[in-house]
Amino acid sequence: MQPKILIRDENAFGASGHSGKRLSPSWRGATHIVKLWDQNEYPQLAANEFFCLTAARKCGLDVSPYRLAEDGMALVIDRFDLRMDGTYRGLEDFCVLNARRTDEKYRGSYESQVMKRFTQFANSTHVNEDMEKLFTLIALNCAIRNGNAHLKNFAIVYDDVHGEARLAPVYDLVTTSVYIPKDCLALTLDGSTKWPAAKDLRKFGETRAGCTPAKVRRIFQRIAEALQETSREVNSYAQEHPAFAEVGQLMLREWDEGVNASLRG
C-alpha cells in the first residue's frame, strides 16, 4: 500500500489576509495529494514518478501540476478533479467502469477493458482526441516499462452525469522494472502480458484507437523524443543528487530498451 496524504492549501481559492502557503492535512476540500514511499523497498520512487510524469507532459498528455520535494522523498500533485469553487468533478476509474472490484484491477485487456470501454462512456465531442491520448499513454507505459498500468490507473472525469466525459489527466506513472526486473504489462495486449513489439503496438493503435499508420508513427516519434529530452534532465538531477544516480541509470536503460523494442523494433 502506497501512503498518500491529502492536504489543503488554504490560499488555493483566493483567500485573502494570508501571506505564504498555509497547508493542512484534510480529506475535505483537499487541494493536493502528497505521495510517500518506503525508501527501503522502492528507493527514489518519488523522483522516478516525477520524471515519468515529465515525459508524459512532453508527449503532449494532460498532467496535473506536480513537484518533487527538495529531499526527493515525496511527490506533491495538484488534484485534477477540483473545481475553482472548491467542489469536485466526477471521477471514475476503469475498475468502476468495468464493474470490477479493486482486487480485480489486473484482470482484463487494454483492447476491451480500456479502449473499448472508454468508447462506451466517452460521450464528448473530443472522443477522437481522447482516444489518441489514451493510445499515447498506453504506448508510453510500454516504452518506460511501467508494469502498473492497471484498471485503476486510467480514469474519466465529468462535470455532470449527463454531460461529456473526458479522459482524466495522467497519474501513477512509474518505471516499475527498476524494482521488478521481470515485470510485464499489467493487462494483456494481443492476449499477452509481454512487452509488445512495435508491430503489435502499431496494430493496436490502428485497430483500437482508430489512428492512421502515419499518426501512429508520429505518436511513437513524439514519445521517443520526449524520453530523450527527459533523459537529459534525469542525468542532470542524478549529478546533483548522487543518491538517485543508480535508479536514474536503471531508468534510462529501461527507457532505451522500451523505445527500441516497443516503438522501433
For each predicted feature, which ranges?
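Anionic ligand-binding catalytic core segments
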Residues: M1-L151, A155-G265
